Amino acid sequence: MEFKVIAEYFDKLEKISSRLQLTALLADLLSKSDKTIIDKVVYIIQGKLWPDFLGYPELGIGEKFLIKAISIATNTDENSVENLYKTIGDLGEVARRLKSKQQSTGILGFLGTTSKESLTVDEVYSTLSKVALTTGEGSRDLKIRLLAGLLKKADPLEAKFLVRFVEGRLRVGIGDATVLDAMAIAFGGGQSASEIIERAYNLRADLGNIAKIIVEKGIEALKTLKPQVGIPIRPMLAERLSNPEEILKKMGGNAIVDYKYDGERAQIHKKEDKIFIFSRRLENITSQYPDVVDYVSKYIEGKEFIIEGEIVAIDPESGEMRPFQELMHRKRKSDIYEAIKEYPVNVFLFDLMYYEDVDYTTKPLEARRKLLESIVKPNDYVKIAHHIQANNVEDLKSFFYRAISEGGEGVMVKAIGKDAIYQAGARGWLWIKLKRDYQSEMADTVDLVVVGGFYGKGKRGGKISSLLMAAYNPKTDSFESVCKVASGFSDEQLDELQKKLMEIKRDVKHPRVNSKMEPDIWVEPVYVAEIIGSEITISPLHTCCQDVVEKDAGLSIRFPRFIRWRDDKSPEDATTTDEILEMYNKQPKKKIESPAVDESV
């Protein structure tokens, strides 16, 4: 299969703003792709060489070295490449222009032909894999030579998307939900297959693997798919409520209540002597927690399992729980074993999804928890999450206050009974979180996606000082604007913000973004931030839940304030539009709706 086919589709996809058209065009590409390499095609569409959970290196070529590779491939002076980049602001477009110029002035162009050996998807994939995996002395020069070799063979359009792929900025607006829908159309005969494919993806979060199973064994093979150790399951998510009485009522008056820890959610896989740890975002974080690997090996019985829990920082002297931020030191420190001594952790387990070749996601919580409790040996490091079974509001409240006093964020209330299965990848009422009140009218913080930025005035002039934030709508796989946040940032965070946003800046609005408000710059929906506000109000300026509460108006957060970045969350893990609506409906209503803040000033 020629790489040119993918490049031509990417070129079309980049110009489309309708998700329906995007999905249809992507389905067309998948149906025309070589079935023997369909997994590689899917990964390339996702903008990666392999799933994040494998923990393999990324391409690791910076802007400076890309410029050098383009310079070598197009026989152009490096300064000229750099100057053109400063003018255009897109290295992919720089490569396209220089290749076009080279093509028209070269001997083949002079003879009226551009015939050359075609660049194949296999060649692109294998070469870029070498680029990513090459390490050691002289590796940087080898990476540049390998990439320059690809760019030399590429035509202008191929060069454009090769460079963008290496940069991690394909800019074609494709999310996983869009790929799932396109796969249903291309391989399953239509949207009716979406549920089957989505279920399989929730159990094995590897779209390339799912596509390969479909083309080799058919859509029916997905119906019997089980979790596989080494491929993360998409985590089950909770709804939120701030009223204990209402929560217990939702649960039918009886529930298991766990501490909600202020740590890092972790999915732990074991097969024989191999242990993997995956984050909430399904990234391989095993290298950050060699101590946890050791604890699991020693204290959890079983040859093959997938369990879930929270890794929590512990004060080495008092044994008390420390906040989530303490775990960040593990990512920053070069000496992980020194970090283990300074920032020790405990693991609090709360679920079991797979054990000794049996899929437990379809079994009720009580059965899962009973087995989990039976396989944990007595020890000081890996424990079952603190929990009670509550059948009255007083017990729920008392346990909630105890969780808060011991450093937790609140509690997770979980349904029991035969229908209380593990809903992989779904947010539902089987789990409800009750978090502490932040002494504002909003009962909880929200996690929102940055989709744009605004330049400041006065001492902040010329710098991005406020952000356009959006909630995620899983039904349309889009991000709907909900507020403009300007407070809560330190000077250091504002300085860091400039660099963050300039790296993901776009010329036009991303096709997955739905916003009436026009920021000074648009950005890729990549970063997630935790936001608090005074209340949720009706706003004609924002598109979150547009026309749901009031015609021609959406919902907005009044007086929003930045709390922290949520690097542990992907954009699709952000607070959903339905959750924003639920929070709005749960607010104490005033006789007259609070006026929306005029965020245009």
From Swiss-Prot:
Q: Which SUPFAM superfamilies match?
A: ATP-dependent DNA ligase DNA-binding domain, DNA ligase/mRNA capping enzyme, catalytic domain, Nucleic acid-binding proteins
Question: A biological process (GO) annotation for this entry?
Answer: cell division
| NCBIfam families linked to this entry | dnl1 (TIGR00574)
UniProt KW keywords: ATP-binding, Cell cycle, Cell division, DNA damage, DNA recombination, DNA repair, DNA replication, Ligase, Magnesium, Metal-binding, Nucleotide-binding
EC number(s) from the headed UniProt entry: 6.5.1.1
- Give the Gene Ontology MF terms in alphabetical order: ATP binding; DNA binding; DNA ligase (ATP) activity; metal ion binding
State the HAMAP family in the record: DNA_ligase
The annotated subunit structure for this chain is: Interacts with the PCNA heterotrimer, probably via subunit PCNA3.
Q: Which Gene3D superfamilies match?
A: DNA ligase, ATP-dependent, N-terminal domain, DNA ligase/mRNA capping enzyme, Nucleic acid-binding proteins
| Record protein name field | DNA ligase
What controls its activity? Ligase activity stimulated by PCNA heterotrimer.
Binding residues for ATP, per the UniProt record?
Answer: 258, 265, 280, 310, 350, 427, 433
**Active-site residues?**
260 (n6-amp-lysine intermediate)
Q: Which gene encodes it?
A: lig
CDD domains (alphabetical):
Adenylation_DNA_ligase_Arch_LigB, OBF_DNA_ligase_I
Named cofactor requirement(s): a divalent metal cation
Give the similarity note. Belongs to the ATP-dependent DNA ligase family.
Catalysed reaction(s)?
ATP + (deoxyribonucleotide)n-3'-hydroxyl + 5'-phospho-(deoxyribonucleotide)m = (deoxyribonucleotide)n+m + AMP + diphosphate
Q: Report the protein's function.
A: DNA ligase that seals nicks in double-stranded DNA during DNA replication, DNA recombination and DNA repair. Interaction with PCNA enhances ligase activity. DNA polymerase I, DNA ligase and the flap endonuclease may be constitutively associated with the PCNA heterotrimer forming a scanning complex able to couple DNA synthesis and Okazaki fragment maturation.
